[in-house]
Amino acid sequence: MSVRTAEPADLAPLALLWWRGWRDAHLPIVPKALAARSTLDSFIDRMAVTLPRIRVLGPVGAPFGFHMIRGDELQQLYVAEESRGAGVATLLMIDAEHCLQQAGVATPWLGCAIGNARAARFCQKTGWTLVRTQTLPSEIPGGWFPLKVWRYEKTLAQRSAWSARAESELLEARLASVRGPTEGMDRETGVYVTADGIPWGRRAGDRLGSRQV
């Protein structure tokens, strides 16, 4: 299984994965005003706009995780809770750095919300360096919310094709034994059923079905 470009069928599950992951990581550490504006619908809208530049790991319609790049910024990287600890984040990071290199970016950057210790550890583990604290505009419905973040940067060194391939193959072998998210689209009813059995996707699917993605 390789990292791939997102498809329209990924939209609803990706938005849900992103929203859940954001809440898990950020609710305890961001201002309440930002948390209140960060609704599931807002993540659906943002994912619909950014889907063409999303890279995904996992089956179509049942992603394990994704990353999003904007210019020289690794803007987002999230993994479904069920798939954490299996190397998914590392595979996504490898792909993100490759995409940035291919785009001619020598020193990309990313923003990590202050207090997000798990994300900070992963950044450091994968060779990113904390360079400063800065304020970034966090997107909310109808505007932006100023959020202080840790800014990480990394100088992308050229790696041999063999070393990159070997690392990816090792991680993919580990992923083969991991069971992905249990949620997905019921082919008979067209309802997107979450892992806890909630038929959330019909509402989202109806909304998203009218969009041009």
Language model segments and positions:
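A short beta-loop-alpha structural element at the N-terminal edge
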Residues: 2-16
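Conserved GNAT-fold acetyl-CoA-binding loop/helix
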Residues: 16-45
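A short helix-loop-beta-strand connector motif used in the catalytic cores of GNAT acetyltransferases and
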Residues: 42-56, 73
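Conserved beta-strand in the GNAT
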Residues: 56, 61-78
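Conserved acetyl-CoA binding element of GNAT-fold acetyltransferases
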Residues: 70-82, 90, 111
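Conserved acetyl-CoA-binding loop-helix of GNAT-fold acetyltransferases
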Residues: 85-98, 121, 125
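Conserved GNAT acetyl-CoA-binding A-motif
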Residues: 100-111
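C-terminal "cap" of GNAT-fold acetyltransferases
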Residues: 109, 113-120, 125-175, 180-186, ...
